[in-house]
Amino acid sequence: FGDPIKGVFTDEPQLNCAGYPWSVGLPDAFEKAYGYSLWDNLWLLAADCGEYRRFRYEFWQLVGDMFRQTFTLPVSQWCERNGLVMTGHFACEDGLCDQISSCGGIMGHYALMQLPGIDYLGNRVTSPVLMKQAASVSRQFNGGEVLSETFGCSGWGVTLARLAWIWGWQSALGVTKPCFHLAAFTMEGRRKRDYPAFFSYQEP
């Protein structure tokens, strides 16, 4: 570790976005944190009445805290002990609402990573929120470096000029290190259509 392996890249760790995340420890942790029963108020996740705003805020705050404590923090600490950086990105980090249900809010995770990262997909300009959240946290906690898994979904016909345009948008908003998506050993089977382009010998 450390030479030549510099870090560990995590790709889209997330909670169950198809429903509400659950853990056997969640009810006790909720009551300890907020002083009232999770069980008695679960229905407020689906009904807009009473103290539903407060309950939802506290529910998602706790879910995010538990995800950070049981995944991001242990991985980050392991990386530090082994001379590595924790980098990569989480799922749905480009939307403020989506990131709550996918990881409990992204910025707390970024603060625990030695090299926060994003996933910049597509041949397009995205919302500046994606880059600015990572850059903001990195400047406060991690020295200002931000990694981007970039150029995925830009298509087989993407030009170097277009790639420069995509990268320019990211770097103007605080991203400092590209991680090209992707370099496959072969294009056989489904890989040919796996979010092109590739950055390997197959691409002229």
What residue spans do the PLM features occupy?
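Hydrophobic targeting/anchoring helices
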Residues: 70, 74-77, 82-204
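Polysaccharide-binding and catalytic clefts of secreted carbohydrate-active enzymes
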Residues: 1-78, 82-106
